[in-house]
Structure formats: structure tokens, C-alpha cells
From Swiss-Prot:
One of its GO terms (cellular component) is cytoplasm. Pfam families: SMC_N. HAMAP family: RecF. This is DNA replication and repair protein RecF. The keyword Ligase does not apply. GO terms for biological process: DNA replication; DNA synthesis involved in DNA repair; double-strand break repair; SOS response. ATP binds at residues 30-37. CDD domains: ABC_RecF. One of its GO terms (molecular function) is ATP binding. InterPro entries: DNA-binding_RecF, DNA-binding_RecF_CS, P-loop_NTPase, RecF/RecN/SMC_N, RecF_2. The gene is recF. Gene3D superfamilies: P-loop containing nucleotide triphosphate hydrolases, RecF/RecN/SMC, N-terminal domain. Keywords: ATP-binding, Cytoplasm, DNA damage, DNA repair, DNA replication, DNA-binding, Nucleotide-binding, SOS response.
Length: 371
């Protein structure tokens, strides 16, 4: 799949923009704060109905403007597709081929993207929250059912935490807590199951890619660490039983702290290279190779799952990779994946890639094709 045309109105620093893109590599050059990342962000938003930079949609609307609009014309294997998003003070409206989608889970997944920015290099050494977000973003694009289940889980979790805060310091419990606990565990079982299956699929690709980048010297293993024990066979009744055991063990502390202490919102991923925890013992090079392997594995897994390659968004990240890793990344996507690269200059980009790329220059909210 690839995006053929992007139209923006009152989005970030773009008053109006109407630009066409090529199906291979598109390089966007410009100084900082001129609008390079805003283009990437708009494409990302079209795919996921959210920004990778802020949780507040109204920050995307130009100052004092009543709304922002993002439109994209895409070409997929099964034909053309149009996506349309309008942001306003009342929220957001999304359309697929002109038809409004009432649930975001019905919208997300129409187009797939993989984002790789400097912050993604923290995937290995950063907080568990970064790794959970990685899980949710990538799995959510491939499984609308997972997105729906995750939204249900987050809604019940919010209600349960609210009730726990109300019960803080009180001697008596509330029957509603048992109801919400049962509901939370039922959805938690499904979310955990989907994550477990996703990691098993991702592992196969990531191990192969990491081995290639390390020239056969390293073996990468991804371990999913949910808040309760999961057997390799993923027995759902035992998983459910594990959640209830966790609840029994932690319910007094939950009452004392006013928050839920078990469930998918506390999951994590651990990466091992040659049996060593990369976060704790890995070199910076190993951590970056692991992050790169995961991103390339995402691309292959999406192709395998949905039948089409995603769009790759490289936001100011090539300069963070050494020549060897950059070369491996660009070679892996060559002629297969539509790619957007943002950079302040082209000096650090592979010469052959530049020869085949379409170059755009951005300056103060204006984007123009060079040459």
C-alpha cells in the first residue's frame, strides 16, 4: 500500500497543503520547526486516528482555527482507498471512502504504518509503558477485535480504579467491586491471549532479522511478561485462574493504594540477546540492533497478516543509526515499502537511496518537490 496524495487544512503549521507522493522513498528536508515531522504525523494520524507526539488532539488544530482536516488518497492491492479526518473542539470524525465510521476500531487498520523515530530506540531501555504502547499500536492495526477488547479493558479499569479510590480508608467493601473485577478479568484474559500470540509471531521474524544484522553472531529472544503467569500452551482457564489468584493476593494493597495492581496495563516485554537481558547488560549497539530488528519484523508481520506492506515513517532516525544499520534498514525496504524520511540534510543518507528517492523541501508550512 502507499499514499498517493495528502491534503491538510489548518493542521499544525500547515494552513493548506496538497501534495502528491511517490510509491518508493520520499525524503523531506528542512530545518527544525519548519514542519517536517508534521507531515509524518498527519500520515500516522490518518492510519491510527491519534498522534505519536501528543495525546491532545486539539494541539493539532492551528491556533484559533475552528477545525483541522487531514485527507489521504491511498492505493492498496485491492484498489484505491480514501481516508478523511476532521478534528474540532467537539472531537474527531473519521471517514473511509466517504462513509463515517462511528467506532474507531472500525476505522483503524484500513491503512497500516510503522513509525521509527529516535524515541523508538528507547524501546529496549525505556519504561514498560513504551513497550506496551508498541504492542498496542502494532497489534491494534492488525486486529480490530484486539482494539475493541483493549478499549473495553481500559474503560472497566477506569471504573474499577475510581471505585477503589472511593473505598480508600473504608472498612466495608462494595459488591460492585466484585462485578468490575469479574468483568476486568474476562477482558484481561482476551487481551493477554492476543498479545501472547502476537509476540510469538513477531519473535519468528525478529530473530531471523536480528541474526542477519549481527551476521549470525547474535540470537534475539522476545519474552512476554504479563502480570500473571502464562504457560507456553496458553491455557485460558489457567490464565483466568491466575488473574483471580493475583486479585486475591493484591486486593488488600489495592484498597490501600486505590488502584488496580494486576492486569495487562502492567505487562512488559524483555529482550534477550545470546541469553543476556539487553536492557540491563546489552551495549548501545545491541539495544539499537534490537529496536531495528523489531521495526523490520513489524513490517514483515504486517505483510504476512494483512497481505500488504505498511507505509514506513522514518522520523529523523537515520542520523541516529550507524552506516551499517542504516544500510541494512534501507536495503530491507528497497522497492517494496513506501518510505518517508525526514532529515535536516541529506549528508547522512545512503547515496544510492538518495538517487532513487523523491526529495521535498519544507519551509514555514510549505512543502515543495525539489527539481
Amino acid at each position: 500500500m502507499h499514499i498517493e496524495r495528502l491534503t491538510l487544512k489548518q493542521f499544525r503549521n500547515y494552513d493548506e497543503l496538497d501534495v502528491s507522493f511517490e510509491p518508493n522513498v520520499n525524503v523531506i528536508i528542512g530545518e527544525n520547526a519548519q514542519g517536517k515531522t508534521n507531515v509524518i504525523e498527519a500520515i500516522y494520524f490518518l492510519a491510527l486516528a491519534k498522534s505519536h507526539r501528543t495525546a491532545r488532539d486539539k494541539e493539532l488544530i492551528q491556533w484559533e482555527a475552528p477545525f483541522a482536516r487531514i485527507e489521504g488518497a491511498f492505493q492498496k492491492q485491492n484498489g484505491p482507498l480514501s481516508l478523511h479526518v476532521v478534528l474540532s473542539g467537539k472531537g474527531k470524525k473519521v471517514k473511509v471512502n466517504g462513509l463515517e465510521q462511528r467506532r474507531l476500531s472500525d476505522y483503524i487498520g484500513a491503512v497500516n504504518v510503522v513509525m521509527f523515530g529516535p524515541e523508538d530506540l528507547n524501546l529496549v531501555k525505556g519504561s514498560p509503558q513504551i513497550r506496551r504502547r508498541f504492542l498496542d499500536m502494532e497489534l491494534g492495526q492488525m486486529s480490530p477485535v484486539y482494539l475493541h477488547q483493549l478499549a473495553m479493558y481500559q474503560k472497566i479499569l477506569l471504573q474499577r480504579n475510581h471505585l477503589l479510590k472511593q473505598l480508600f480508608g473504608k472498612a466495608n467493601s462494595d459488591p460492585m467491586l466484585d462485578v468490575l473485577t469479574d468483568q476486568l478479568i474476562e477482558v484481561a484474559v482476551e487481551v493477554t491471549k492476543k498479545r501472547f500470540e502476537f509476540i510469538q509471531l513477531l519473535q519468528r521474524w525478529a530473530e531471523e532479522i536480528h541474526q542477519a544484522i549481527s551476521r549470525g553472531k547474535e540470537k534475539l529472544v522476545i519474552t512476554y511478561e504479563p502480570s500473571v503467569h502464562v504457560s507456553e500452551q496458553l491455557n485460558l482457564s489457567k490464565l483466568r485462574e491466575g488473574f483471580y489468584q493475583a486479585y486475591e493476593q493484591k486486593k488488600e494493597r489495592e484498597r490501600q493504594r486505590g488502584t488496580t495492581l494486576f492486569g495487562p496495563h502492567r505487562d512488559d516485554l524483555v529482550f534477550f540477546v545470546n541469553d543476556k537481558d539487553v536492557q540491563t547488560y546489552g551495549s548501545q549497539g545491541q539495544q539499537r540492533t534490537t529496536a531495528l530488528s523489531l521495526k523490520l519484523a513489524e513490517i514483515e508481520l504486517m505483510k504476512e497478516t494483512v497481505g500488504d506492506y505498511p507505509i514506513l515513517l522514518l522520523d529523523d532516525v537515520l542520523s541516529e543509526l550507524d552506516d551499517y544499520r542504516q544500510s541494512h534498514l534501507l536495503h530491507a525496504i528497497q522497492h517494496r515499502v513506501q518510505t518517508f524520511v525526514t532529515t535536516t540534510n541529506v549528508d547522512g543518507i545512503d547515496h544510492q537511496t538518495l538517487q532513487e528517492a523523491t526529495i521535498y523541501e519544507v519551509e514555514q508550512g510549505s512543502l515543495k518537490k525539489k527539481g
